[in-house]
């Protein structure tokens, strides 16, 4: 590959008529020699509002050093983030999923608007990862994602705790099992420093999935935020993206159908977040890879759940790092025929070649169960179907002993109303709590229900009360929960016509989600019901009008699809 080939976009500045453009670039420090090299963007979601992202500006500088040491010119950019843990349970949560697509669009705009030849995207909070990957897939120029790393566990009275411990503490306080002072002690010790939330929650799930896809460096997803390994992998990402340029390696070479199958496989084995379904569908859509909810069920049936990680297990993500990390898990799964070892990754090597350099899981470790004695014989993420969710719904059943729940619905049109019912003991064992009109269009923004689900668990009703919604759940959620119900209420899905007292069935063995309401009664209720108008102001108004169903990834660019489904 020639130097000009490596400058496949920035060479636009070479001509005489681009002298004014170069004048601007010289003010940023570029010299004649720099104009002869590739321009590589380094864009992060740095912000001071959350531990997930507070360190990312410094990480951007490390990535720049890597780019420069590889002979290219680095340029640092910033984009937005919305911190789920801070927005949770507030009106701000409507902006969380919305931010995923804003991040994707802003990265594409900044990188394309400045004609960079390649880029490194650095993220820390939940929507940063899929947002970055949607942009990477859409642009299809050499690019790597670098994760800011997982937070260290907090410690209280010799016991590891995390943010979810505080959410559940509210339920325990309401139930009389904790004092306000107990909760304050949790609050003050749960988050000891920078990094993404520490269990197998959404941030760590998506960072892992991206590593498995082959779009971040091997081992990087499980390096803790404050570790020396993390600083090294961030700098290495800068060097690696220049190597991708030299190889002519693009995301479309890496993001294959087999790559997504492997990402789902590892997500199942580690007990990842329900949000993985939404985000992997969206990334696949951007990459023009055919992926559907049914693919998750197909893989779920053959892949056991091996990881004893929070929220349903006892270990945090840093514990996985200490026994070999994601590469050791992948190596174990590859050796047992679960992964495609021959596909290419961002290193220019295959999955199998990358993993050959890593050690096996530490002998005697207890974070990852053996295939002969898994935590669960099949995967913990299940796609449900039935007359309550004709287009599907997503359940996470890790740690759930109840395989079938049948009970009366208690229907709420907002999370706030449902929370009030829980706090005032209106929800009794056997109930099915339903929160609707909180889907992608109805929210708008499909907010997560961690505040609500954690209160139910904290009150000791996690296995006794089912929680259903057309919204989402945090990766920190566990219990009898079903989200992403589609079609959503705002689109006139059956959940819009469910009434308090209707009997609802959730069965993880038959993968059923149904309501005991006849077609005739349902049609009668439709005729009697007027759906609320779409939200129509600002960014949420735009989002509500263009976002797709959750069953298709809640993406925002479906209007230009041809019959093949390609963009």
Curated annotation (Swiss-Prot):
[2Fe-2S] cluster binds at residues 52, 125, 197. It comes from the Bacteria. GO terms for molecular function: 2 iron, 2 sulfur cluster binding; dihydroxy-acid dehydratase activity; magnesium ion binding. Signal peptide: none annotated. It catalyses: (2R)-2,3-dihydroxy-3-methylbutanoate = 3-methyl-2-oxobutanoate + H2O; (2R,3R)-2,3-dihydroxy-3-methylpentanoate = (S)-3-methyl-2-oxopentanoate + H2O. GO terms for biological process: isoleucine biosynthetic process; L-valine biosynthetic process. Coiled coil: none annotated. InterPro entries: DHAD_IlvD/Edd, Dihydro-acid_dehy_C, DihydroxyA_deHydtase, DiOHA_6PGluconate_deHydtase_CS, ILV_EDD_C, ILV_EDD_N, IlvD/EDD_N. Pathway: Amino-acid biosynthesis; L-isoleucine biosynthesis; L-isoleucine from 2-oxobutanoate: step 3/4; Amino-acid biosynthesis; L-valine biosynthesis; L-valine from pyruvate: step 3/4. Its cofactor is [2Fe-2S] cluster; Mg(2+). Functions in the biosynthesis of branched-chain amino acids. Catalyzes the dehydration of (2R,3R)-2,3-dihydroxy-3-methylpentanoate (2,3-dihydroxy-3-methylvalerate) into 2-oxo-3-methylpentanoate (2-oxo-3-methylvalerate) and of (2R)-2,3-dihydroxy-3-methylbutanoate (2,3-dihydroxyisovalerate) into 2-oxo-3-methylbutanoate (2-oxoisovalerate), the penultimate precursor to L-isoleucine and L-valine, respectively. This is Dihydroxy-acid dehydratase.
